[in-house]
Each structure stands twice: as C-alpha cells, then as structure tokens.
UniProtKB/Swiss-Prot annotation:
GO terms for cellular component: large ribosomal subunit. It comes from the Bacteria. The lineage of its organism: Bacteria, Pseudomonadati, Pseudomonadota, Alphaproteobacteria, Rickettsiales. This is Large ribosomal subunit protein uL1. It comes from Rickettsia typhi (strain ATCC VR-144 / Wilmington). Binds directly to 23S rRNA. The L1 stalk is quite mobile in the ribosome, and is involved in E site tRNA release. Protein L1 is also a translational repressor protein, it controls the translation of the L11 operon by binding to its mRNA. SUPFAM superfamilies: Ribosomal protein L1 (SSF56808).
C-alpha cells in the first residue's frame, strides 16, 4: 500500500471542499499542528474520533515481525466501553463490583454462540479458557478473544476491568504493516489528544521487532471521522 493509497481524499459537498482547503496533502505536519488542522477542518455535526494510521516496515506474515499490544491512553477514548467477564460463580460479585457490564460463564458462551455479542471487551480468568475455546472462532475475528498478552486473561479482574473502562486500546499490525486505531474524540483538548498520541506512538515504537532490518516507521497519518487526513513529519516524533 502506497502513501497515496493511505491518504484520505476528500471531495464532494461544499463543506467537504472547504475542509479540504484547510489541509494540504503535500504538507507534513508535527502532531500539534496536525491536531489543530483537523479540528479546524471538521464539519460534521457529531463528535468525531481522532484516528491514526501507522505504516510500518514489517511483514506480519512472518512470526518474528508481529507487532501487537495494548496502550492505556492517558485521556481515555471518550467511548463507553461494555465489558464482559467470564469467570466462575465465586468471582462474579467481584467482577460486578468492579464495573463489569456482563458477568457469567456458560450463559455468556451461549449468548455468543447465538450471535448475541453485547460487549466491547471480553475478560476471562485462566480457568475458563477451555470453555471459551468453543467460541474462539467467533470472538477471534472480531478481536474479542481474551488473550494473556493483552491482559484480558487474568486473575486480577478488578484491574483488567479498570484498564478496559479507562481507555485501553489494542493495536495490531495487519496486512502491509498497517496499524489503525481511534485515540479519543476531537472535542478533547489539544493537550489530551497529544497525550494520547504520544502514548500510542511511543508504545508502537517500543514494540519494534528485535533484529528488524530497514526502516521501521514508514508513515503516520491522522484523520477525523468523515474528515480530513494529514501526514505527520516523522522527524518531529
């Protein structure tokens, strides 16, 4: 995928054309300027999400070049996150008290099998993974399968729920080494958006595969939902 393919083209209505005029596709921006530009170019009536696309110099088809992890965004995501906890009965009250929206075991598994997935994050205790394996093919493609590397298979239910609710974002490089994530609402203060951006970009940089040859960080683009897209000057990171 070329940089040109990644860049979001804006055309059509008058509002979109006006927004397009406020950003230049051939200009590189630092993070501060990029956030300012995207805010000034936003025209939608709802509160759009600040989105990031990172192109990495990796080949995810190779097991030693998989880039994946989670980031706790300092300012949160601005979204209401519904958390399901699959655990044994003796820990259900603990999960409920910690803020879980859906708690149980076989009842949740049955709902998943019937197509009822009313949660954004699924947390499980290790002793429930054999049961959850029966719905792995359903949860996996949706990015909802509990994973110890992501902190969603754990004995520390309380902390896992807290992280999920407070703005924990999962990232994973897909085909062509592309990572995409939402990092907060455009209504956030510039300072909060920059905190989230720096935390996310920093985490991805730290996740660079050991021994990778060549350039790791190829390009970064920021955009808002249905809005403009700007390319980041990598030398400013």
């Amino acid at each position: 995928m070329s940089n040109k393919d990644i860049f979001v083209k804006i055309s059509g209505s008058k509002k979109i054309r006006e927004a397009r005029e406020k950003v230049k596709s051939d200009t590189l921006y630092n993070l501060t300027s990029a956030v300012e530009r995207l805010k000034s170019a936003s025209y939608v009536k709802f509160d759009p999400t600040l989105e990031i696309v990172m192109k990495l110099g990796i080949d995810p088809r190779h097991s030693d070049q998989i880039v994946r992890g989670v980031v706790n965004l300092p300012a949160g995501t601005g979204k209401i996150i519904r958390v399901a906890v699959i655990c044994k009965e003796e820990r259900e009250e603990e999960a409920k008290s910690a803020g879980a929206d859906l708690v149980g075991s076989i009842n949740i598994i049955d709902e998943i099998k019937s197509g009822q997935i009313n949660f954004d994050v699924c947390i499980a205790t290790p002793d429930m993974m054999s049961m959850i394996s029966s719905v792995a093919r359903i949860l996996g493609p949706k990015g909802l399968m509990p994973n110890p590397k992501l902190g969603t298979v754990t004995l520390d239910i309380k902390n896992a729920i807290k992280n999920a609710k407070s703005g924990q974002v999962e990232y994973r490089a897909e085909k062509a080494g592309i990572i995409h994530a939402g990092l907060g609402k455009l209504s956030f203060s510039d300072q909060d958006l920059l905190k989230n951006l720096n935390a996310f970009i920093g985490a991805v940089i730290k996740a660079k595969p050991v021994g990778l040859k060549g350039s790791y960080l190829k390009a970064i683009y920021l955009s808002s939902t249905m809005g403009a897209s700007v390319q980041i000057d990598l030398t400013s990171i």
